[in-house]
Amino acid sequence: MVHFTAEEKTAITSVWGKVNVEETGGEALGRLLVVYPWTQRFFDSFGNLSSASAILGNPKVKAHGKKVLTSLGEAVKNLDNLKATFSKLSELHCDKLHVDPENFRLLGNVLVVVLAVHFGKEFTPEVHAAWQKLVAGVASALAHKYH
């Protein structure tokens, strides 16, 4: 179980309140598919993923990125219970979709990069550390059913 201090919770929620879920989600998932091209195999139904511009402009990538980031919003609301929050999604990704759980960690790291780019100096080392802890906790919760 991940424990967040009051300061970490504030750092996470203060940034989250300013996140454009649609834009940031699409960019994070798009970057994942570009930077780690082997992750594309889980998105065969998304159509053209042949280049960075095709991926970043793909409406299905953007829509799924929004969906992913919307679920991350549930983590922000339930920082003290990530495992239960992601129990059903963990089961889906493990049993039905067979997603490599390492991809959750990779996507979390890419999301932190996207947030740093968007928030610049506001994304201080302390804020970065809190978000890194969050995405690691979410990745662990999503990987739970694999163990």
From Swiss-Prot:
The modification Phosphoserine is found at residues 14, 51. Residues 3-147 form the Globin domain. GO terms for molecular function: haptoglobin binding; heme binding; metal ion binding; organic acid binding; oxygen binding; oxygen carrier activity; peroxidase activity. The keyword Metal-binding applies. GO terms for cellular component: blood microparticle; haptoglobin-hemoglobin complex; hemoglobin complex. The keyword Iron applies. Keywords: Heme, Iron, Metal-binding, Oxygen transport, Phosphoprotein, Transport. CDD domains: Hb-beta-like. One of its GO terms (biological process) is hydrogen peroxide catabolic process. Heme b binds at residues 64, 93. Red blood cells. Hemoglobin epsilon chain is an embryonic-type beta-type chain found in prenatal and neonatal marsupials. Belongs to the globin family. This is Hemoglobin subunit epsilon. It comes from Notamacropus eugenii (Tammar wallaby).
